[in-house]
Amino acid sequence: MSILSLPVAADTLARVFAGAVNPAPKAAVRFAEIPGRTSQATIPTRYGPVAATLYHPPSDVGCPPVYVNVHGGGFVVGHPEQDDPWCRYLAANAGVVVVNPDYVLAPRHRFPAAPQQIYDIVCWAAEEERDWDGTRLCVGGQSAGGNLSAAAARLALENCTPVIALQVLHYAPLDLATPTRDKPSTIVARAVLKPWMGEVFDTAYIPDRAQRLDRLASPAWGANADEIVGIAPAVVVTAEHDRLRDEAHRYAEKLHAAGSLIEYHEVTGVDHGYNIMSGALDVTRAVYSRIAGHVARATGSP
């Protein structure tokens, strides 16, 4: 057993990691040419209020749809501003209000706190008294944010509310039951996500290995997706060299079997976090355009 599988070690490293990591996107992929119209909100949840930045479409025309964006960070790093370029892009190109919230993080708040809180935020976004049309609602995220988005969609299915028009799962970890060391990458040691990192994140988030089998933690594992008929339509995007690619592909196949897969798209030549940690502007722009098109079509946005 690795020492990193011990909560006392993983928790310490997770806190160090969270304090040391600067996840600001590379300058080349910041989309500085797209201005942001933003406001602030405080969202009540069962774990207390959370702050959120709201990104508004360029013009006030009608009552726009809404997209809840869930940032990544291995369930332990909390920097929603890392998604600022994406949120500005989506608001401008899909005509939606983007809700970009904080959420509770491990190790202080372990599973299932984060998925439950994201579900609360999605429910809040769907309420009638908002400045947008909550009946045209999407949720999505990249990396850990994609995992939490999938969990929110599962809870919406099980609770029969709210209706989600689209879930977007962008290079998401969808099988926490399988250790990261057992997830291969086509570029081996050069892969962004190192096995030790996955072990730290998973242990800090869910110390009990048995609990990692839960449907909200590992929707792609085993029979967890056998009863998802009716779940929100999904777009699943993976990166060719990402260790998490195969599990996302498995979940896409399960979504397809349930009649809920809109598109599975593998981005060639890139690794985990390519749209933040690299200068791959053309690739990033193409993927953002693809996702924004799906969001616009799902919500009936002009």
Where are these regions (language model features)?
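A glycine/proline-hinged amphipathic helix-loop "lid/cap" segment
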Residues: 1-58, 211-212, 300-302
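Short beta-strand element of the alpha/beta-hydrolase
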Residues: 63-74
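Gly/Ala-rich beta-loop-alpha elbow adjacent to hydrolase catalytic centers
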Residues: 141, 145, 149
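Alpha/beta-hydrolase active-site loop signature
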Residues: 74, 103-107, 174, 271
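A fold-wide structural signal in alpha/beta-hydrolase
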Residues: 66, 95-99
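Catalytic nucleophile-loop/oxyanion-hole region of alpha/beta-hydrolase
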Residues: 79-80, 86, 99-136, 278-284
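Alpha/beta hydrolase fold serine-hydrolase catalytic domain that processes acyl esters and thioesters
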Residues: 135, 150-302
